[in-house]
UniProtKB/Swiss-Prot annotation:
GO molecular function: nuclear retinoid X receptor binding; nuclear thyroid hormone receptor binding; peroxisome proliferator activated receptor binding; protein domain specific binding; protein homodimerization activity; protein-containing complex binding; transcription corepressor activity; transcription regulator inhibitor activity
Organism: Mus musculus (Mouse)
Tissue: Expressed in islets of Langerhans (at protein level). Expressed in a circadian manner in the liver.
Keyword Nucleus in annotation: yes
Subunit structure: Heterodimer; efficient DNA binding requires dimerization with another bHLH protein. Interacts (via N-terminus) with NEUROD1 (via N-terminus and C-terminus). Interacts with ID2. Interacts with NR5A2, PPARA and PPARG. Interacts with RARA, RXRA, THRB, NR5A1 and NR1I3. Interacts with EID1. Interacts with NR1D1. Interacts with RORG. Interacts with NFIL3 and BHLHE41. Interacts with HNF4A; the resulting heterodimer is transcriptionally inactive.
Subcellular location, principal: cytoplasm
Lineage, uppermost ranks: Eukaryota, Metazoa, Chordata, Craniata, Vertebrata
Modified residues (Symmetric dimethylarginine): 57
Location of the protein in the cell: Cytoplasm; Nucleus
Protein name: Nuclear receptor subfamily 0 group B member 2
Length: 260
């Protein structure tokens, strides 16, 4: 049997299925989102690094969303009156889902293209240069994968299909922000009460459409839970690192909220 079949990816077997060795060496599906087959023809393509097609425009829109997120928190007395340490812990845990809700609310769209992969020689030269310079930062940090970005885009599309209003977005942000399960909180009981209040407010907004609102509420909460599975590193690498470089978003938000 010939191994040089045209149009067959090296990660595929003769029947078009992933080879056993490739499957063993690939990352666990628990840590990597899997896109439907319609988006890609093979596992190799799903793992390819990608970058924004219009980084300056998209990063500017992402920064606008981040600023609106800060404004939302500043105008929320129930958050501002919490102990500063609790504010920091909630921010560290919840900034990603809040930012994603902001992207969905502002209908931010973006396209990605395959990122060039540096040659082995270039990697060796970069490693030698960085090892010879004290305090040098690694410049070959992996780009986001196509699978991860497509997963993120599908989450945003799902929220757009819900057509949430401003009040629904606001109360949903409250249910995500006030998470009493964040470790180390001093006022966890009070935060649990705030989360319940936000949940009740969301239910009241949907009440005029009862009983259909029950199914809508379930869909909203289900979609919100998926946002927590999108890693913050993906958001930083995709939306902020192309323009701002390596940045700690949590520290940036703390500075903007005057928590440090």
């Amino acid at each position: 049997m010939s191994s040089g079949q045209s149009g067959v990816c090296p990660c595929q077997g003769s029947a078009g299925r992933p080879t056993i060795l490739y499957a063993l060496l690939s990352p666990s599906p628990r840590t990597r989102p899997v896109a439907p087959a319609s988006h890609s023809h093979c596992l190799c393509q799903q793992q390819r690094p990608v970058r924004l097609c219009a980084p300056h425009r998209t990063c500017r829109e992402a920064l606008d969303v981040l600023a609106k997120t800060v404004a939302f928190l500043r105008n929320l007395p129930s958050f501002c009156h919490l102990p500063h340490e609790d504010q920091r812990r909630l921010l560290e845990c919840c900034w990603g889902p809040l930012f994603l809700l902001g992207l969905a609310q502002d209908a931010v769209t973006f396209e990605v293209a395959e990122a060039p992969v540096p040659s082995i020689l270039k990697k060796i030269l970069l490693e030698e240069a960085s090892s010879g310079t004290q305090g040098a930062q690694p410049s070959d940090r992996p780009q986001p994968s196509l699978a991860a970005v497509q997963w993120l885009q599908r989450c945003l599309e799902s929220f757009w299909s819900l057509e949430l209003g401003p009040k629904e977005y606001a109360y949903l942000k409250g249910t995500i922000l006030f998470n009493p399960d964040v470790p180390g909180l001093r006022a966890s009981c009070h935060i649990a009460h705030l989360q319940q209040e936000a949940h009740w407010a969301l239910c009241e907004v949907l009440e005029p459409w009862y009983p259909a609102s029950q199914g809508r509420l379930a869909r909203i909460l289900l979609m919100a839970s998926t946002l927590k599975n999108i890693p913050g590193t993906l958001l930083v690498d995709l939306f902020f690192r192309p323009i701002m470089g390596d940045v700690d978003i949590t520290e940036l938000l703390e500075d903007m909220l005057l928590l440090r």
